[in-house]
Design a protein with these regions (language model features):
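C-terminal (or distal) subdomains of carbohydrate-active enzymes
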Residues: 1-220
């Protein structure tokens, strides 16, 4: 924890701007231009410092999908590669609210439902950091269904790196061979990363360990 004291001038300083429209909401920070669509998904994430789009064209970030999960065996610990054939996008947004509009950060609170389950999420952007924080609470009440969040990043690379207990592991993100096709899921302790040259995107977490990066779509 860190205690930060702010002067009165700092408290009055607006380092962000918000534009609310019927079908989209736009947030401007020193690091990003962020556009949320009517379902609360990230329709655009523009990196100002590096002058580039983070997400693939016409694709959404923070996109949640519920997939049918009926593996051939090991029902509790196994995921079969065909699970993506039957999925439902979590698009039923019941709440979108700007909160914590202060000198240090701006937060958005989202609430979604799908079937019998509830998903609450707080997304935080900072005045002095390029980190985007997602605090996600899921009250999951489904049988033989799993939930994944997707971030389709616009990077020119054929591999992703995953944190493991004794270092890290690099795997291909294509399915050109049967061996690559079988590696549709990767374990990761605390992070995964996709990079090209001097630019990359990392997905960090503190409680989930199943990752995927097929065709450049980072999922958790």
């Amino acid at each position: 924890y860190q205690k930060v004291s702010l002067s009165e001038d700092a408290k009055k300083y607006n380092w962000y701007s918000i534009e609310n429209e019927a079908e989209r909401k736009t947030l401007e920070t020193p690091f990003y231009t962020v556009v949320f669509d009517e379902n609360g998904m990230i329709a655009r994430l523009y990196d100002k410092k590096n002058d580039r789009e983070v997400l693939k064209p016409d694709q959404k970030g923070n996109r949640m999908v519920m997939y049918e999960d009926k593996p051939m065996c090991f029902d509790n610990w196994d995921i079969d590669m065909y699970y993506t054939e039957k999925g439902w996008e979590v698009s039923n947004l019941s709440r979108f609210e700007w909160t914590d509009l202060g000198p240090l950060c701006v937060s958005i609170e989202l609430e979604r439902t799908i079937s019998n389950s509830l998903i609450r999420q707080t997304i935080t952007f900072y005045a002095d950091s390029a980190v985007i924080r997602f605090d996600t609470y899921v009250d999951w009440k489904e049988h033989q269904h799993l939930l994944k969040v997707h971030f389709p990043v616009d990077l020119h690379t054929d591999e992703a790196t995953f944190d493991i207990q004794f270092g890290n592991l690099t795997r291909k993100i294509h399915q050109n061979t049967s061996w690559d096709e079988a590696r549709f899921e990767s374990c990761g302790q605390k992070w995964m990363d996709m990079s090209e040259g001097h630019y990359g995107v990392s997905l960090l977490n503190d409680c989930k360990y199943g990752h995927s990066a097929i065709d450049g779509v980072m999922t958790l």
